[in-house]
């Protein structure tokens, strides 16, 4: 069954389907909505089926391999494969994108272009997580750039052009470094370019060149993850983008940076990774505390959630640099956990804005009684974000803590220092999240409910939140269901 081109199908199906959107009837938005939702759902069900029935979880190597000559003169191939590391992120992409399409139901301004861009992004994201060729990885990385820019600039808030320009400026610079590093790696020491990950892993470089290449790739990932000081595009982008776009940004786009760091930097440049790891651990710790502290001063609901995402990504960086399987496993778990939680919080923030027409926390208050379902869902995911036991965030952060504690790569004093400041970041998290809940749902009746018509969450919104909340609880209660996916794959990294 592995000989069947399953991966090509789940990558190209949404892309080809996107080009049929202009042919759909223009009078009714319902047609393009259901068409796009059906495409995403079918693709998600197909990937779930093939991974559930045909993936060998005891095999640590890549499966469903495909390799087709594309540009023979430079050795470029359409090379795909899936292992435990990429499978979880592919399934996350399918789930979040499908629900983001459903979340975009209220979009009425040029819906054909909106859903076209979402399907193009969907293909690019799956393509990136399945790429086994470095040039193909680069192409899929770049495929995200224009759709995200258009989604922000055309369907965003009042400062959407500023946010979109800032986003493309940061990511374009990161892409330039990625482009230079990619071609340097592939052409170094060979007359014919070597693009396949397995072949590149066998190359050796002078230490100074390895460090330069590590930083070149790392800069691109640092923008996407993001890592301070390359993070300032994120609050502006989340603050202005439509909440369905925010779901894709928080749920999937940020994870591309973490995935690239593990798949390329750790694997291809192990000596440079060991050299920079202590500094990255310190940077990740500073990021946790800094972003959590800035959260407390944010009066804009979406910007507060954006800074909380930056803080949580600091844990991912620490786990990647822990040099332990449990720490690295925790980093991957944190990426998936945050993908679910972050997407949910931005969706809830957006649907709240649809009702009260403000994201200013100082203008909110006392809406719990009129919107009890919204209040319950916001509370549940806020508790998940602060890593409450029985939820996925707790499992991920605990594994990262254990990974850095048990790491023999670092001295005991360094580990104690990092754990101490990580704990401080963990303490700050409930402060800004519970404060957010208090400002939104408790306190004075700001909106004079007797003269306003409030509508609580409807079936569509409840379905989206429940679909994201169920895996958060399952991972929190039975983490081995998720961890077993990549356990064997991590043993060979």
UniProtKB/Swiss-Prot annotation:
Enzyme class: translocase
EC number(s) recorded for this UniProt protein: 7.1.1.-
Chief location category: plastid
Membrane-spanning parts: 4-24, 34-54, 87-107, 111-131, 134-154, 167-187, 212-232, 242-262, 276-296, 313-333, 334-354, 385-405, 417-437, 462-482
Any one Gene Ontology cellular component term annotated for this protein: chloroplast thylakoid membrane
Catalytic activity, reaction form: a plastoquinone + NADH + (n+1) H(+)(in) = a plastoquinol + NAD(+) + n H(+)(out); a plastoquinone + NADPH + (n+1) H(+)(in) = a plastoquinol + NADP(+) + n H(+)(out)
A Pfam family: Proton_antipo_M
Gene Ontology terms for molecular function: NADH dehydrogenase (ubiquinone) activity; ubiquinone binding
Cross-referenced InterPro entries: NADH_Q_OxRdtase_chain4, NADH_Q_OxRdtase_chainM/4, NADH_UbQ_OxRdtase, ND/Mrp_TM
Gene Ontology terms describing biological process: ATP synthesis coupled electron transport; electron transport coupled proton transport
Topology term for the membrane: Multi-pass membrane protein
Keywords: Chloroplast, Membrane, NAD, NADP, Plastid, Plastoquinone, Quinone, Thylakoid, Translocase, Transmembrane, Transmembrane helix
Entry's localization field: Plastid, Chloroplast thylakoid membrane
PANTHER family per record: NAD(P)H-QUINONE OXIDOREDUCTASE CHAIN 4, CHLOROPLASTIC, NADH-UBIQUINONE OXIDOREDUCTASE CHAIN 4
Family: Belongs to the complex I subunit 4 family.
Official protein name in the record: NAD(P)H-quinone oxidoreductase chain 4, chloroplastic
Originating organism: Chara vulgaris (Common stonewort)
């Amino acid at each position: 069954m592995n000989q069947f081109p399953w991966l090509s199908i789940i990558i190209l199906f949404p892309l080809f389907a996107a080009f049929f959107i202009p042919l759909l009837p223009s009078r009714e938005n319902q047609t393009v909505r259901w068409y796009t939702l059906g495409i995403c759902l079918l693709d998600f069900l197909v990937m779930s089926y093939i991974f559930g029935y045909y993936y060998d979880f005891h095999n640590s190597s890549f499966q469903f391999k495909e390799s087709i000559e594309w540009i023979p003169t430079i050795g470029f191939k359409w090379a795909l494969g899936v292992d435990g590391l990429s499978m979880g992120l592919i399934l996350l992409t399918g789930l979040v994108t499908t629900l983001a399409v459903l979340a975009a139901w209220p979009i009425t301004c040029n819906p054909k272009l909106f859903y076209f861009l979402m399907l193009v992004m969907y293909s690019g994201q799956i393509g990136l997580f399945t790429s086994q060729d470095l040039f193909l990885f680069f192409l899929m990385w770049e495929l995200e750039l224009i759709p995200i820019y258009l989604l922000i600039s055309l369907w965003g808030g009042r400062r959407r052009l500023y946010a979109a320009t800032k986003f493309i400026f940061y990511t374009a610079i990161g892409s330039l470094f990625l482009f230079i590093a990619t071609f340097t790696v592939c052409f170094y020491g060979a007359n014919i370019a070597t693009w396949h990950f397995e072949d590149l892993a066998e190359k050796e470089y002078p230490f100074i060149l390895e460090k330069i290449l590590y930083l070149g790739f790392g800069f691109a990932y640092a923008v996407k993850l993001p890592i301070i000081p390359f993070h300032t595009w994120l609050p502006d982008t989340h603050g202005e983008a439509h909440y369905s776009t925010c779901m894709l940004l928080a749920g999937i786009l940020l994870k591309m940076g973490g995935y690239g760091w593990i798949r390329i930097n750790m694997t291809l440049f192990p000596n440079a990774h060991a050299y920079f790891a202590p500094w990255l651990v310190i940077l990740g710790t500073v990021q946790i505390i800094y972003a959590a502290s800035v959260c407390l001063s944010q009066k804009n609901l979406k910007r507060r959630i954006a800074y909380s995402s930056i803080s949580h990504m600091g844990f991912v960086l620490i786990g990647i640099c822990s040099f332990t399987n449990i720490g690295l496993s925790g980093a991957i778990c944190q990426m998936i956990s945050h993908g679910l939680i972050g997407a949910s919080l931005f969706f809830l923030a957006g649907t709240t804005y649809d009702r009260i027409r403000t994201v200013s926390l100082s203008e909110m208050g006392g809406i719990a009684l009129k919107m009890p379902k919204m209040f319950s869902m916001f509370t549940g995911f806020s508790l998940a974000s602060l890593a409450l036991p029985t939820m996925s965030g707790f499992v991920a952060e605990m594994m990262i803590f254990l990974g850095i504690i048990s790491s023999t790569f670092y001295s005991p004093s360094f580990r104690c220092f990092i754990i101490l400041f990580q704990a401080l970041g963990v303490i700050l998290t409930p402060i800004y999240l519970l404060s957010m809940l208090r400002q939104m749902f408790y306190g004075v009746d700001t909106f004079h409910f007797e003269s306003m018509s409030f509508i609580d969450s409807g079936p569509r919104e409840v379905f989206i939140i429940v679909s994201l909340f169920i895996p958060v609880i399952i991972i929190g209660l039975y983490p081995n269901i998720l961890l077993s996916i990549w356990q064997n794959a991590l043993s060979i990294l």
